[in-house]
Amino acid sequence: IVQSYQSWYGVGLFKKDGKNRDFRVVANVRNQTQIVAVLDRSPIRTFSDMKGKVVNLLSKGSGSNVNCENIFKGLGLMDKIKPKFLGFAASGRALGDRQVDVFCSAGAPFTIPALTELSIRKPVRYISMSPAEQKQLTSKFKFYAPKTIPVQKDVRGMKEPALSFSYPVFWYAHKSMSGEAIYEMLKIAAEPSNLKKLANTAGYWKTLNGDFSSLVSYKMLVHP
């Protein structure tokens, strides 16, 4: 939702190009959370501890980069950290090699392969927001909802839940597509046997739904 909001209003990544309202939302595919993690032996325990540290915010232009930057800008820490902009796999390797101190990424919904795989060799910890930090971010960015990431048994080193936020990932279509075409597309995707095949390829498809509540306050449109 973050990139679609920026495109709809011509801000952030889309400031140079201006508003683009030629798309419509057709389905809610899944919810993601935002993960901020460190090596388990790191002295970093809180977001305040990240001042002066090397924090990877993922590749510029990616959706996860926007969400990572929103965290540190929203908490007033962006000018107090040393940002890096490595991709998913490279950032996992960099954390393991201690080239970066902090790893930030989207979770689908609560893990990301690069971090989970690293934890097998070098245990990691998710950094929890304080309740005040969580409220500060979800109040500033209305498209985020408070979410607690439960302990993930596949992530070695994670022993406590972590306060974070969640946000929806939508399926879009051009506004010029006919209602009939959209209906047929969704009908085929949502047919139980087809949905099962999609979910076997990417598990998040099993959560395909019609929850568009997060669009209301920003007056963004669902097809048609």
Q: Where does each model-flagged region fall?
A:
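Short helices/loops that flank or line small-molecule/ion binding pockets
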Residues: 1, 70, 89-103, 116-121
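Ligand-binding "clamshell"
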Residues: 8-25, 113-131, 137-156
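Short, glycine-/small- and polar/acidic-enriched structural segments
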Residues: 1-59, 126
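Acidic, S/T/G-rich, low-cysteine, solvent-exposed domains in lumenal/extracellular/periplasmic regions
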Residues: 149-167, 192-197, 201
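A bilobed periplasmic-binding-protein/Venus flytrap-type ligand-binding module shared by bacterial periplasmic
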Residues: 33-44, 137-142, 157-181
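An extracytoplasmic/periplasmic, membrane-proximal ligand-sensing/linker region
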Residues: 90, 107-126, 136-142, 168, ...
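Bilobed "Venus flytrap"/periplasmic-binding protein-like clamshell domains
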Residues: 31-97, 196, 213-224
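Beta->alpha turn/N-cap motifs
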Residues: 1-13, 87-88, 104-112, 129-131, ...
